[in-house]
Regions:
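A short, basic N-terminal segment
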Residues: 1-29, 249
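Conserved AAA+ ATPase "SRH/arginine-finger" region at the nucleotide-binding site
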Residues: 66-67, 160-161, 172-186
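Conserved NTP-binding/hydrolysis module of P-loop NTPases
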Residues: 71-90
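Conserved Walker B catalytic segment
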Residues: 102-105, 109-152, 156-162
Length: 253
């Protein structure tokens, strides 16, 4: 299921994460790590972060990595070279690092750009690539970091962090995205229905039905969206007046 920032509901945990992450980036803190289980909304948060900076027409330039599966450090550096649109034919790690550093210096001081690398699915990163990222974070002047990195990852990323204390110590902002509670789940459902254009006077779910949705999905946003999609299809096809607890229980079976 593709993330859709338009339907974002600023629940307490997601809203706090997004706001704190934005502040940390604007303060040029360096390394940021957001951890959460599958379906907790990490990818949506990454897209919202991009939208928020673009909205203000800022001098930040974001580079997005969706699938960090590289065989080795050279492959990772070659990927970054292409991502940063650096023209070069070298396969030397030292040369690639020097070229990337030159790009970051040029972007910062000649083009007045703050470079941010966003990595989704960060749990796929290998140990040797963690060291590359740590080296990139060393590129700084007395008062300016030449690159900031935001990693969105599943909980197993913590195991990799334990193996790299020097990298872990660099984390300026860390946040764990939790599933929604029952109250936020109900707000999440109501918000998405409103954004979809539902008349405020129209009720699609009973309160008991929404409580059962929470019980079934355990507050994971992706599961809530998929489950409610099935419920609404049932509601339309069967010509129901409202989605009640009986309809939800039937779908849960």
């Amino acid at each position: 299921m593709a993330p859709d920032p338009e339907f974002f509901c600023a629940t307490q945990t997601h809203g706090e994460c997004l706001n704190r992450l934005e502040i940390s980036l604007r303060l040029n803190r360096g390394l940021h790590v957001v951890i959460g289980d599958i379906g907790t909304g990490k990818t949506t948060l990454s897209r919202l972060l991009l939208e928020r900076f673009l909205m203000y027409g800022s001098n930040y330039e974001f580079f997005l990595v969706l699938d960090p599966t590289w065989e080795n450090s050279i492959d990772f550096l070659q990927f970054l070279k292409k991502l940063f649109r650096i023209e070069s034919n070298t396969n030397s790690q030292v040369d690639l690092m020097n070229q990337i550093e030159h790009f970051l210096l040029d972007s910062t001081f000649n083009n007045n750009k703050r470079i941010v690398l966003i990595i989704d699915e960060g749990q796929k990163i290998r140990s040797d690539q963690i060291e590359i990222i740590r080296t990139l974070l060393n590129f700084e002047t007395n008062n300016v970091k030449l690159i900031q990195v935001v990693i969105f990852a599943q909980p197993e990323f913590k195991e990799l962090l334990q193996l790299h204390e020097n990298f872990k110590d660099r984390i300026a902002f860390g946040f764990t995205v939790q599933p929604l509670g029952e109250k936020n789940t109900i707000e999440f459902i109501d918000h998405r229905l409103k954004v979809a254009g539902l008349d405020e006077d129209k009720k699609v779910f009973t309160e008991k039905a929404k409580a059962l949705v929470y019980k079934h999905t355990k507050g994971y946003p992706r599961k809530i969206v998929v489950f409610c999609h099935h419920l609404i299809i049932d509601y339309i096809i069967n010509g129901e007046e409202i989605i009640n607890s009986e309809i939800v229980l039937t779908r849960m079976q």
